[in-house]
Amino acid sequence: MRWPMQNRTTAVIAVALATTALVACSSRSASAVSSTATVTVDGKDSTMHIVKCTQLEWYRMINIGSDFAGAKIVIDQRAHPVTAESVRIQNLNGFTGMYSRGGDGNADLRLSGDKFTITGTAHGYKADKPGDAATATFKIVTAC
């Protein structure tokens, strides 16, 4: 009667190892919450206390602030050097706009350990003149 118990134990261990392997190989990863980020738009700083970092294969998504006011960044970590694919600024210091690689604007990304610094220009509009095109400079500093 010892053999059936050993078979059950072996089966449980095998299932646990298989589950661990599947989770480790999954393309989805857990989100990490960073403490703060500083987003500067046209020289005016905003300190944001909600920063969510998500890794999906070679892409890192950084969500700063909220849907109402904040920034969303997509970083391509496959590229050498690592590059910002897009930066979306939403209602910060009266500006809403974006940079997208291959489109208008520019972005320079510097990585030091887990600290990202992204600087550049984005195209969009200002809250006081939403019908007029506007360009703004930005600098985003955060850790993920």
Swiss-Prot record:
Subcellular localization(s) per the UniProt record: Cell membrane
Principal location listed in the UniProt entry: membrane
Keywords from the UniProt entry: Cell membrane, Lipoprotein, Membrane, Palmitate, Signal
Transmembrane segments: none
Listed InterPro entries: LpqH
Any one cellular-component term (Gene Ontology): plasma membrane
Membrane topology: Lipid-anchor
Signal sequence coordinates: 1-24
Keyword Signal appears in the UniProt entry: yes
One Pfam family from the record: Myco_19_kDa
Lipid attachment, kind N-palmitoyl cysteine: 25
Residues lipid-modified (S-diacylglycerol cysteine): 25
Family note: Belongs to the mycobacterial 19 kDa antigen family.
Name of the protein this chain belongs to: Putative lipoprotein MAH_0816
Originating species: Mycobacterium avium subsp. hominissuis (strain TH135)
